[in-house]
């Protein structure tokens, strides 16, 4: 019996959660009106190439069940396939830090306790309490917290975003002063000033993860027409909402006063008190809502990305103990290792960066460069597919035959290289005496991370460790649309009696 196909709107709804990245608005705001240019650049020349190339790879006969691990393994070999899935997982160990910084910024306002956002030691302790609390809450199974994640998305992300957009619109319509220049020269960045371009990496981060939804193209009605249309609609929505959100922050908060972890709360405070000085309590309510929403997002990331590493363990590429799950189908050893790594990153970034904007910027840049290495492998794998494996059957093709495919993938590949290198240039928004710290933390962390999966792959004896269970890919019906696509993971965790942890 043929499975019911999903409609254009249904497919769009599966991916739409990625367009609301409220905790990135302050970083977008540091680019002032350049944010529109960067959103267009990233959306049209990076997001769309990734989405289209991923869709073609997802429909290749025999590749439909494996995601990026399978795509890269089939084109570049198992070693690089493991590296790709490793980078896709490892980036979130840094990403947790930026999300929790944002939560701490909101809570510091609610509790009127600024040290929670500025004192490195207190900030680190707060990070540990939130992260480990949310991690342990997930050990009972993700089904228990699915409703919490949905509620967090609506209450803590969607509603505050609507309120922010409404307040900002009223502020602008009222003819109130705007903190950034608005003229025809303000839209396009000065390419001779490299330090002003580095913020582009945060815009790339906003678009990352779409390949996780590309796999569902096999369930989509008329994919040749509907998939590109869904992605174009998604880009338009992302550009519109992120431009409004970033501009709202930039317009009301002076650049010198902008906190990257608490900038959204600063914006709510400025706008609400502008209209009514007696509504300070409302700012705290909204800050609490946002903290709740981002906590829900953090909890959704705890298990999802580790599913890819669990699939690698099932294929015998990691030690046997990493195949273990508890009775709730949570890969506890992997999640605990993830937690230890997050703790180490939290210490490095919080104490190394002083717990201020520098820590936040390094964390964002490091997240992006780790993820980008995985995307470079993805694009190289795609080139191998279209030039050396062109005879493989597939149900979707990137438009333009081989020439069009090369141009589209080439643009995405080159922009990935540009974003990777530009990440190591200190941003214009940090003080000159902090530039060396920024570069050293980022460079050392990146080099260690880049070689780590290859060391792990070589050191583990893979002989005799046969695949114990072929990974089973999520269907659209299994997906919680309130969860960011990359946070869902792509595979079911198959519980085997002999691999259940004993109490």
UniProtKB/Swiss-Prot annotation:
Q: Which Pfam families match?
A: AA_permease_2 (PF13520)
Q: What is this protein called?
A: Glutamate/gamma-aminobutyrate antiporter
Biological function:
Involved in glutaminase-dependent acid resistance. Exchanges extracellular glutamate (Glu) for intracellular gamma-aminobutyric acid (GABA) under acidic conditions.
User: Which cellular component terms (GO) are annotated to the entry?
Assistant: plasma membrane
Write down the superkingdom of origin.
Answer: Bacteria
Which molecular-function annotations from GO does this UniProt entry contain?
A: antiporter activity
Q: Does the keyword Magnesium apply?
A: no
The principal localisation class reads membrane
Cite the InterPro entries for this sequence: AA/rel_permease1, APC_superfamily, Glu_antiport
Q: Does the keyword Transmembrane apply?
A: yes
Question: Catalyzes what?
Answer: 4-aminobutanoate(in) + L-glutamate(out) = 4-aminobutanoate(out) + L-glutamate(in)
The way it spans or sits in the membrane comes to: Multi-pass membrane protein
The organism named in the record is Lactococcus lactis subsp. lactis (strain IL1403) (Streptococcus lactis)
Give the keywords, sorted: Amino-acid transport, Antiport, Cell membrane, Membrane, Transmembrane, Transmembrane helix, Transport
Q: Which GO terms describe its biological process?
A: amino acid transport
The subcellular localization recorded is: Cell membrane
Q: Which residues bind L-glutamate per the record?
A: 33-43
- Which protein family is it in? Belongs to the amino acid-polyamine-organocation (APC) superfamily. Glutamate:GABA antiporter (GGA) (TC 2.A.3.7) family.
């Amino acid at each position: 019996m043929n499975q019911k196909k999903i409609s254009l709107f249904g497919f769009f709804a599966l991916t739409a959660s990625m367009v609301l990245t409220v905790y990135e608005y302050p970083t977008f705001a540091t680019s002032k009106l350049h944010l529109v240019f960067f959103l267009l650049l990233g959306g049209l020349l990076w997001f769309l190439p990734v989405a289209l190339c991923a869709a073609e790879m997802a429909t290749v006969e025999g590749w439909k069940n494996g995601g990026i691990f399978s795509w890269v393994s089939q084109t570049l070999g198992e070693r690089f396939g493991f590296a790709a899935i490793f980078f896709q997982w490892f980036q979130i160990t840094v990403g947790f830090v930026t999300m929790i910084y944002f939560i701490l910024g909101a809570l510091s306002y609610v509790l009127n306790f600024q040290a929670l956002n500025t004192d490195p030691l207190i900030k680190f302790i707060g990070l540990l309490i939130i992260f480990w609390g949310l991690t342990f809450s997930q050990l009972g199974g993700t089904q228990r917290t699915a409703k919490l994640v949905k509620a967090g998305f609506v209450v803590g992300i969607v509603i505050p975003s609507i309120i922010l957009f409404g307040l900002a619109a009223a502020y602008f319509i009222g003819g109130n002063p705007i903190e950034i220049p608005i003229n025809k020269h303000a839209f396009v960045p000065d390419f001779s000033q490299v330090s002003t371009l580095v913020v582009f990496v945060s815009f790339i981060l906003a678009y990352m993860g779409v390949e996780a939804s590309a796999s569902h193209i096999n369930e989509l009605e008329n994919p040749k027409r509907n998939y590109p249309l869904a992605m174009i609609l998604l880009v338009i929505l992302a550009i519109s909402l992120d431009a409004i959100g970033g501009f709202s922050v930039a317009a009301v908060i002076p650049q010198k006063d902008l906190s990257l972890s608490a900038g959204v709360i600063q914006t709510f405070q400025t706008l609400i008190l502008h209209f009514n000085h007696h509504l300070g309590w409302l700012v705290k309510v909204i800050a609490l809502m946002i903290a709740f929403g981002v906590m829900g997002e953090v909890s959704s990331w705890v298990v999802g990305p580790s599913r890819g590493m669990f699939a690698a363990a099932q294929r015998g590429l990691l030690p046997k103990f990493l195949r273990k799950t508890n009775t709730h189908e949570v890969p506890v050893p992997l999640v605990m290792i993830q937690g230890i790594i997050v703790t180490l990153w939290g210490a490095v970034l919080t104490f190394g960066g002083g717990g201020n904007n520098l820590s936040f910027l390094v964390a964002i840049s490091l997240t992006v460069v780790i993820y980008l290495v995985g995307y470079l492998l993805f694009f190289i794998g795609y080139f191998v597919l279209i030039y050396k494996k062109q005879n493989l059957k597939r149900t979707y093709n990137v438009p333009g035959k081989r020439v069009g495919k090369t141009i589209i993938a080439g643009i995405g590949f080159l922009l990935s290289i540009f974003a990777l290198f530009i990440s190591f240039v200190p941003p214009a928004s940090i003080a000159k005496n902090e530039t060396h710290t920024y570069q050293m933390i980022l460079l050392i962390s990146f080099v260690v991370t880049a070689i780590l999966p290859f060391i792990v792959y070589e050191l583990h004896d893979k002989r005799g460790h046969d695949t114990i269970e072929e990974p089973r890919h999520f269907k659209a019906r299994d997906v919680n649309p309130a969860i960011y696509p990359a946070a869902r993971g792509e595979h079911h965790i198959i519980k085997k009696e002999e691999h259940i942890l004993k109490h």
